[in-house]
């Protein structure tokens, strides 16, 4: 496909054309100069898609479960996008886990679009990029967006929180129920899923989660379900879709969906403003002054708080006499 002008690529992306859409998502991920114009064009068309987060520890079968969820939603006539947040190989710079390899059952369906968001060695900013990619997919007409993350670290939890509804996927073995309580997953879960439930211990793991939920102070009227699935054979997938749809109905009826989305937009705005202010600040501080500031800090001649205050106020450290240090 020949190179398109920015406005033409944006127009065709909003029309749902797959190749321009893929290029548009690359703009977002790589912070292309045209990404801002793209996102501005998309924003007014967002809000129609239900964004589902799928998170949990590695090895929980999330990719297989996401594939089955996409197939079930397609059977119901919904257009589905999958955003798979993958680790990146430090050698090749590409996604270590190829989403099209894992989800090749979906590749022939024009109603499904699959995209990796690679971490490129750092999770910084990935939650913002994921939310922006979902905006593009939302504006392009996808009705269900599945956001899969690879683990349960803080950054993965931030990515999961870009969703309207989040399912935490665990397996019967390895004390996942205990880990869920330790890793803060209780706070972000709208649904719990015990996948690979054809293995021994699935009922016991589900009961452990239910007991933990019962002991926890309720923060809303939504009763968090604990579901059993065996994604490799398709068992329990229909029930999981029904649970997601019940949660969407509850979110909508109670006004919680609107509140969550407003809160996410506020967090996103705050993150973008912080990023812009930092960029402006660093552009105003000469490199030599910045190095002097770091040296001042490293030699314990000034505290971080005092130095930060002075840098912000003056745009750089004031040179002064350096007292000899005792050895």
What would you call each of these model-derived segments?
Residues 4-55, 60, 66-155, 162-177:
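Nucleotide-state-sensitive switch-loop elements of NTP-binding domains
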Residues 6, 21-22, 35, 206, ...:
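A general structural signal for well-ordered alpha-helical segments in protein cores
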Residues 159, 172-200:
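Flexible active-site lid/hinge loop adjacent to a nucleotide/diphosphate
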Residues 228, 239-315:
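Long, well-ordered amphipathic alpha-helical subdomains in the mid-to-C-terminal portions
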Residues 316-326:
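Intrinsic disorder/low-complexity segments
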């Amino acid at each position: 496909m020949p190179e398109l002008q920015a406005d033409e690529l944006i127009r065709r992306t909003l029309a749902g054309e797959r190749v321009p859409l893929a290029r548009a998502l690359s703009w977002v991920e790589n912070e292309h100069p045209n990404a801002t114009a793209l996102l501005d064009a998309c924003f007014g068309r967002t809000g129609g898609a239900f964004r589902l987060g799928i998170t949990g520890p590695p090895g929980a079968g999330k990719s297989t479960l996401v594939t089955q969820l996409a197939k079930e939603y397609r059977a119901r006539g919904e257009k589905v996008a999958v955003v798979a947040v993958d680790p990146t190989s430090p050698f090749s710079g590409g996604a270590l886990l190829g989403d099209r390899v894992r989800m090749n059952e979906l590749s022939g369906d024009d109603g499904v679009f699959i995209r990796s968001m690679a971490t490129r060695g750092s999770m910084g900013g990935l939650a913002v990029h994921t939310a922006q990619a979902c905006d593009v997919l939302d504006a392009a007409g996808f009705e269900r967006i599945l956001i899969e993350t690879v683990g349960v670290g803080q950054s993965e939890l931030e990515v999961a929180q870009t969703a309207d509804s989040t399912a935490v996927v665990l397996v019967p073995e390895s004390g996942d129920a205990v880990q869920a309580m330790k890793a803060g997953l209780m706070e972000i879960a709208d649904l719990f899923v015990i996948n690979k439930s054809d293995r021994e211990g699935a009922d016991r793991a589900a009961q452990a989660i239910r007991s933990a939920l019962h002991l926890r102070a309720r923060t809303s009227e939504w009763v968090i379900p604990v579901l059993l699935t065996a994604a490799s054979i398709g068992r329990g997938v229909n029930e999981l879709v029904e649970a997601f749809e019940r949660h969407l109905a509850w979110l909508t009826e109670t006004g919680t969906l609107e509140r969550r989305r407003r809160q996410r937009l506020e967090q996103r705005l705050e993150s973008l403003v912080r990023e812009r202010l930092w960029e402006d600040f660093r552009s105003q501080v000469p490199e030599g002054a910045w190095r002097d500031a770091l040296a001042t800090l490293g030699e314990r001649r000034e505290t971080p708080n005092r130095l930060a205050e002075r840098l912000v106020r003056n745009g750089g450290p004031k040179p002064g006499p350096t007292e000899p240090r005792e050895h």
